Each structure stands twice: as C-alpha cells, then as structure tokens.
A protein has these predicted regions:
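Divalent metal-cofactor coordination and adjacent catalytic microenvironments
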Residues: 1-105
C-alpha cells in the first residue's frame, strides 16, 4: 500500500488493497468511492472537524480504512456507531471538538 499521510489521499485502490480484494470491478470502485466519502463524513460529524481539517491528523487514515472495511464486510452504506471498534472510538474521541462548550459573545 502507498504511504498515505492525509485522509484526502485515500483512493479506491488503497481501500481495495486494504480489503485484500483479488479483483476490482467498476461497480466495486464506485462502491469503494462511496464508502470513502461516507467514512470521511462520519469522521467529520463525529469529531466536529471540517473535511479540510481531517487532513491534519494522520491517524484518521486508518480510521477511514477500518470504517470502509466494516461497511464493505457488512454490505452497508452507513457506519453503525453503536458498534464502533474501541480503538476507532478512542482515536475519534481524541480529536473531537464538538463536545466542548462554545464561547458566546
């Protein structure tokens, strides 16, 4: 697998390699691209970080790959947040800003 340092660098090929898919069809590529987008949106919503800010945290790369793997294995196009992997939940929690009270003027 290529050295990926930013979540925006993840491609369908990277996810296919992470999933150890022997052959990848055009439909698979489309599905993998959707899974990447869904994983990014989930990470952004969970942490309260913008999609642009996600690139500042290299550990979000593995989070995205694991989320894609879970969705691929379960054939779902959503992240089941009630059954998140503990490591993934910990990494996301370390970078969450939406749990902090907002300053008011």
């Amino acid at each position: 697998m290529n050295q990926i340092t930013k979540i925006s660098q993840i491609t369908s090929g990277d996810v296919a390699e992470y999933l150890r898919l022997p052959e990848v069809t055009a439909d698979d590529i489309n599905t993998l691209n959707n899974l990447i987008g869904i994983s990014k949106a989930f990470i952004s919503n969970y942490t309260g970080r913008t999609l642009e800010e996600l690139d500042n945290y290299q550990d979000f790369v593995i989070v995205s790959l694991v989320l894609c793997q879970d969705m691929w294995d379960n054939r779902t196009l959503y992240v089941d947040s009630s059954n998140l992997n503990n490591v993934i939940e910990t990494i996301l929690g370390m970078h969450s800003v939406n749990l902090l009270p907002q300053e008011t003027s």
